[in-house]
A protein has these predicted regions:
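Bacterial Sec-dependent N-terminal signal peptides
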Residues: 1-22
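Beta-strand initiation motifs
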Residues: 22-25, 68-72, 124-131
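Beta-strand-rich domains and repeat architectures in extracellular enzymes and scaffolds
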Residues: 29-56
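Beta-propeller domains
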Residues: 50-73
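Short, solvent-exposed loop/turn segments at conserved positions within beta-propeller repeat blades
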Residues: 54-57, 109-114
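Beta-propeller blade signature
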Residues: 64, 117-123
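Blade-loop segments of beta-propeller domains
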Residues: 71-106
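Conserved small/polar residues in nucleotide/adenosyl-binding loops
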Residues: 133-136
Length: 136
C-alpha cells in the first residue's frame, strides 16, 4: 500500500512540474509578410530571410541571438540585381568557409525566364554581391 502512495505522489509531482513549464516563444516569431523563410546560424547568431510581397528592397534580413527576439537589419539587396526584372522569391542562405551565400529566384531581364541567382557576402549582414552573370 505504501508503494502505491509513493507512485501516486511521484505521478502528481511530475504532472505539476510539466504544467509549470512555459513556452519560450509565441508565433509568429517574425511578424509581417515573409513566406519561404530560411534561417542559418553563424557562430552564436541566427539570420533569417524570405520572400516578401513588398518586392523591393529585396528580401528582408533579420538577426536574432535566441530565435525568439528578431530584429530587421536590412535587406539582401538594396538595389535590384542587374540581370533581373521581377518575381523575386524563395531565397536560401548558406554559410561556408567564412562566406555567406544567398541563392534566390528571379526572372531574367532579357526574356522573363525564371532562374536561380547567387550572391556572396563576407558576413551574413552583407553587403551581398551578385556573382557575374554570363550567357554560358
Amino acid at each position: 500500500m505504501q508503494m502505491k502512495h509513493l507512485l501516486l505522489l511521484a505521478s502528481l509531482l511530475t504532472c505539476m512540474g510539466a504544467g509549470a513549464q512555459q513556452a519560450t516563444f509565441r508565433n509568429p516569431v517574425i511578424a509581417g509578410d515573409m513566406a519561404d523563410p530560411t534561417v542559418i546560424r553563424v557562430d552564436n547568431t541566427y539570420y533569417a530571410t524570405g520572400t516578401s510581397s513588398e518586392w523591393a528592397p529585396y528580401y528582408p534580413l533579420f538577426r536574432s541571438k535566441d530565435l525568439v527576439n528578431w530584429r530587421q537589419i536590412g535587406h539582401l539587396f538594396e538595389q535590384q540585381p542587374a540581370w533581373t526584372r521581377s518575381s523575386f522569391w524563395a531565397p536560401e542562405l548558406f554559410h561556408r568557409n567564412g562566406k555567406t551565400y544567398a541563392y534566390y529566384t528571379a526572372r531574367r531581364k532579357t526574356d522573363g525566364t525564371s532562374y536561380i541567382g547567387v550572391a556572396t557576402a563576407d558576413k551574413p549582414e552583407g553587403p551581398y554581391t551578385c556573382l557575374l552573370y554570363t550567357s554560358d
